[in-house]
Amino acid sequence: MSLNIITEKDKKQSYNLNKLQKRLRRNVGNAIADFNMIENGDKVMVCLSGGKDSYTLLDILLNLRLNAPIHFDIVAVNLDQKQPGFPEHILPEYLKSISVDYKIVAENTYGIVKEKIPEGKTTCSLCSRLRRGILYRTATELGATKIALGHHRDDMLETLFLNMFYGGKLKSMPPKLISDDGKQIVIRPLAYCKEKDIEKYAVAKQFPIIPCNLCGSQPNLQRQVVKEMLQKWDRQYPGRIETMFSAIQNIVPSHLCDSNLFDFKRIRHGKIPEGIEGDIAFDKEAFSPTPLVQENDEKIDFIQGEMISFKEVN
């Protein structure tokens, strides 16, 4: 009898994992298609830190590649920053076990940061700049045409509010960007993925997670405050996070105040400029009492034979 109970439990866990994987595949596949992130012949350099996000990114991209209508290569890259206590064996062992091409780049950025930044001050800004330069250089050396990072939907929303609260800008993380010199394209295939889905997936897949606090840097208190605010909203108002993310995909420049995005000086009597959305000067806007955007876990887009296919991009 106990064996039957275990079997039923295993079946349920397997079903839940399969459902979760399909959702992540769908979200990643849609993001890749919507923003033309990966093209035929690309070599995608997946930046692997050893955290849940980058493990999930690599796993889902490998899964998608099996049935993708285009050919692209994947190489995993980890930057060993020589932090004390960093378990150097974990990532090579894992990557060998799944037969993925990889490169470990050893650079003592930890030592540079400790030398330049006074004790007790946050090291994240300098560390980030150093990492970016090394990863761009590595991408060039490997012939990579795309650099894939593991930022997800929650990261993008947190960044939006951080920029509004502390930077006075309406700015988030772009799903796709080009480096200042025009030589590197960075993509974020997890842009449509929820952090809690990634957390569940990482636990279910038993990825060998490496702690992210080895550098001893001060926590980003501003980001933590924003994260907790969004989590509270998500608990109190189901669907609000989805609606907010939808909002950053539906920008109406004529109803904001940035003259760089919309030329308000063109507005004259008798002529309606292109890009203006409706005359609502004296209207009281009506909103639905519940969020308009509700995620449907059962909706499967771009599926062929249980595997995601990319949209055709002109």
UniProtKB/Swiss-Prot annotation:
Keyword hit for ATP-binding: yes
Subcellular location: Cytoplasm
Cofactor note: Binds 1 [4Fe-4S] cluster per subunit. The cluster is chelated by three Cys residues, the fourth Fe has a free coordination site that may bind a sulfur atom transferred from the persulfide of IscS.
Gene Ontology CC annotations of this record: cytoplasm
GO terms classed as biological process: tRNA thio-modification
Signal peptide interval: none
Domain of life: Bacteria
InterPro entries in the record: Rossmann-like_a/b/a_fold (IPR014729), TilS/TtcA_N (IPR011063), tRNA_Cyd_32_2_STrfase (IPR012089), tRNA_thiolation_TtcA_Ctu1 (IPR035107)
Pfam families, alphabetized: ATP_bind_3
Pathway: tRNA modification
Binding annotation for [4Fe-4S] cluster: 124, 127, 215
Keyword terms of this UniProt record: 4Fe-4S, ATP-binding, Cytoplasm, Iron, Iron-sulfur, Magnesium, Metal-binding, Nucleotide-binding, RNA-binding, Transferase, tRNA processing, tRNA-binding
EC number of the protein: 2.8.1.-
Motif (PP-loop motif): 49-54
Function: Catalyzes the ATP-dependent 2-thiolation of cytidine in position 32 of tRNA, to form 2-thiocytidine (s(2)C32). The sulfur atoms are provided by the cysteine/cysteine desulfurase (IscS) system.
Family, similarity comment: Belongs to the TtcA family.
HAMAP family to which the protein is assigned, alphabetical: TtcA (MF_01850)
Note in the entry: The thiolation reaction likely consists of two steps: a first activation step by ATP to form an adenylated intermediate of the target base of tRNA, and a second nucleophilic substitution step of the sulfur (S) atom supplied by the hydrosulfide attached to the Fe-S cluster.
Entry protein name: tRNA-cytidine(32) 2-sulfurtransferase
Species the sequence originates in: Histophilus somni (strain 2336)
